[in-house]
């Protein structure tokens, strides 16, 4: 302890009074770091146990002097060597007036406390409230830096801006000489004037003047790095070229996009406005464009063409690089001639260059077809050829030809011939059109609820005249009588044949055996005579056809093609047999659709009124046969052809008057006798009398079973046809009355806020019409509103709905009685 005390007394620092005492000897402050003394180490050990005191108070020593080494440290002190009594503060560095770094109070120098290790640094510390003030040095000159006001900085913060301004006092005040001091003092803004001139000069005094000169860029010149000198102008020109404001930058931008970005979508190009730039000759002759399209370039520029094998490649194939071709097609619609012609030549050059890389032998590539907008006249002509189909979705059909749209309006009324309403090209109910039929046709039924079945081969459709000629025409005798009449019987238009019958010669063979066959007069538009017998037809050989032809034949009969070839052949044979048995009675009503001439009808009416009984009519028919004495009856021969009796002549004359108006031949099958209908049925159903009475057929001689069945079926068809023709005019009137009644129905009153639509409103809204309800309404209210005292049946209402294209249905599935 004695050693420590002696060393402490030996190294004790002098008091502040001794340091700053006036002396002639200059004091040199040692700036080199020194080793900490033992006293400082001891104070650091003892300072940890001392109480907290004010660090700026000075205690008096035993001699009564102030001792700076007894400063009490604050409550929290640092524990590092040399900083025991210094409160922890961040080290703040500042610069003095000479630009040298200088630490503030918290800095440590020479490894000692600023108060104890280096007492001379206490002069730089300005304590608050003037506790420790460093006295100024008076006396001789010192070599050290002077303690001036510029060196005395506060301990709070460090401001570098003040140090810089202190070192440069001349640059901070620049007031122009043009503004006098008196004028600056009088700058007051109460008068409301802005004084822009003074404000501009004041702003110029402290704001540096910038270079506001604008670079003028010529958009017509070729902007390249060699031509542009300034870096700013290059950047500005590149911005212009990116937006396509110059001529030379459009194609270069396209080339860069094609080389770098492999796009998969079509890029939109401007045609109007920049069309002259795009389609100019200079653009297509530039080296950048040739370098892209010309095959002499690198192979990496051209896209590799591969076959599309995936759905994605197939869907994106249309977005390829075909901009030039598409622009040429679009340019054709513009009126400018040069702008349209030049792209085609350029595109042709591009195509030949591309095709030359693929095939060396090909020199020219085919040009793309030019698509042009059709004129207004052509568009109107195409609209005239279109056929509009109206109806519900269940009534419209699929058509593939120009004639088949007429089948869309097909209904049950077409199943039965009407007076003066059947056109020449209208098909019979058993005809089979080439294309698919409508849904109404597929399930069409007659009045007796019998479904119509189509068994006719549609591969070679026969007309009405050809079927009748091939079925019912008998061979013409080569007698002189027919040679005189044949040339006079051919005429163009249907007309009365009464004057033709008068030209038949009155002379003929007296012996009935000499002329066993009754000749048949054939009247045709073409004048050609065809002789064919029904019995002479044989089953065609279906085995010689291919499978595809067999399937087509089966489909023509309305059946689906079968897998087995044998089954299709057997099915075709059955269909052919049924066709030969059914086409004779089915085609017969179609030959009597037209009315006879008025003169012939009046003559037959007068004859019909004079006949009262069957015997009288038979005797009168025999007596009337005297005007053609050359035609007599005879027995049947082995050839299968039967001769006509005088009764046959009478029946033939009637059928001739009726049938020849359509240009069809007379019908002769075998020896027949006249069996007219009863008077009651004719008077009730047929107002025109005997004009529609057809003789029935009966066999007097033995014949085959096939002819007997044909005769019976022909009789039944004729009987049904007479009844239908009698009701034809009445059905037309009923349809008109139903239409008037539905349109005349008044609007119904709503019940409990629920509207009740009329029948017309239901039809217009495509609501299914219940036939039972509509029939009841027509019979109770509808027909009475228009003054019609009659009733309609459900079948009649159904026929009317289908003729108008109205969707109808029954309330319950039931069998409709005929």
UniProtKB/Swiss-Prot annotation:
GO terms under biological process: DNA recombination; DNA repair; DNA replication
Keyword set, alphabetical order: DNA damage, DNA recombination, DNA repair, Nucleus, Phosphoprotein
Chief location of this protein within or outside the cell: nucleus
Low complexity composition bias: residue spans: 28-39, 306-316
Compartments where located: Nucleus
Post-translational modification as stated in the protein's UniProt record: Phosphorylated in response to DNA damage.
Disulphide-bonded residues: none
CDD domains from the UniProt entry: SAP_SLX4 (cd22999)
Disordered as annotated region, ranges: 1-39, 53-151, 279-324, 413-437, 587-712
Biased composition (Basic and acidic residues): 90-103, 604-618
Keyword DNA damage assigned: yes
Gene Ontology CC terms, in alphabetical order: Slx1-Slx4 complex
Biased composition (Polar residues): 426-437, 621-640, 652-672, 696-712
Domain of life: Eukaryota
Keyword set includes Phosphoprotein: yes
GO molecular function: 5'-flap endonuclease activity
Stated family: Belongs to the SLX4 family.
Function field: Regulatory subunit of the SLX1-SLX4 structure-specific endonuclease that resolves DNA secondary structures generated during DNA repair and recombination. Has endonuclease activity towards branched DNA substrates, introducing single-strand cuts in duplex DNA close to junctions with ss-DNA.
Quaternary organization: Forms a heterodimer with SLX1.
Record's protein name: Structure-specific endonuclease subunit SLX4
UniProt gene name: SLX4
